Amino acid sequence: MKKCLIFALIFSIPLFIFGQSFNVGEKSLIYQDSSRNRPVKIEIWYPTYEIDSTFERITDLPFILNPTIRDATFIQKDFPLVLLSHGTGGNRFSLAWLAIALAKNGYIIAAPDHWGNTFDNKIPEYFVRYWERPLDISFLITKILADKSISQYVNKDKIGIVGFSFGGYTSLALAGANLECSLLKMNAKTPNGKKEFNIPELGDLTKLIEQISCDNVQKTFKDKRIKAFVALSPALGLGFNSTEQTKTIDSPVLIFGAENDNIAPIKTNAEFYCKLIHSSNFVLLEGKVGHYVFLNEASENLKKEAKKYYIDDNTVNRDTIHKKVEKEINLFFQKSFNK
């Protein structure tokens, strides 16, 4: 197990060092994974030259987001493709702030709803069916690359992923991190497990974890089409205990951890993953930064309704952190795709 070198979030990165800035188009699509009888609803953000002074709100939740142009024209060139995987009980808009920022810098972003694990479609057993999520992402890549209306604008040799929380695990699983199902079930019974698997979005998951039939779960989800991997406060570290589970990871990995994360504590998750993955770097968000800092900024009304997710400690500026995290991720993808 390697020593994890911890880097603080670099607040000295200039905000505009990455070249041309685009306007952002947006569209919604839905695919059907017939092999799993599973709908995969997605949102796509992409660079465009179109200009539109209107902003159509695309979600009922009052997030503070930069404007996008619905169904704008794509630019005739190929861009890197980045997949986003939301956290448990979130949805495809959970990381919209990051999607829009990356699209402005020349990426095509695709974010699915992980069916059964979204805020508006909560199916309890799907909150622990961890294998469905990487399968969603691999399915989505296949569909996008086969869809000529999108694939003609995608550089298939430059595909990356960013995941948050449960989505952070998803990103690492696609890199080649192989969760041990029986270990997860065993650790779910420990004090740490009972704490980590009692989540605000649904409550106690430990009984659902006990019901998983490990023999029927796919062992590895590595997708070689993805060349760079980012995990924001990744969860499910309790399913790992050995570098044998990560030995096939041969692509660059960037892991972010929040020092005050009490949902997926860094010692058993972000920092622990870093120790297991030889090709990873770890960026620590220091101070009173909590787990949900990676979610969108919310309006004042939503902050009142969902304080846990949208109100940070008064020493934490979510907008500032978002800007710096996006720049770190942008720089990471540029280095990874152009090495």
What do these predicted ranges mean?
Residues S242-E244, S251, P265-S279:
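Short alpha-helix in the alpha/beta-hydrolase fold that links the catalytic acid
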Residues L276-A306:
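Catalytic histidine neighborhood in serine/cysteine hydrolases
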Residues S299-K339:
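Catalytic active-site module of serine/aspartate enzymes centered on a nucleophile-bearing elbow/loop
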Residues I249, I255-G257:
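Short beta-strand/loop motif that positions the catalytic acidic residue
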Residues Y126-D157, Y169, A173, N178, ...:
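Alpha/beta-hydrolase active-site loop
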Residues N66-K122, N262-P265:
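Short substrate-entry loop that stabilizes the transition state in hydrolases
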Residues Q20-L83:
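Domain-level recognition of soluble alpha/beta enzyme cores
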Residues L236-L238, N260-A264, H291-Y292:
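Acidic catalytic loop of the alpha/beta-hydrolase fold
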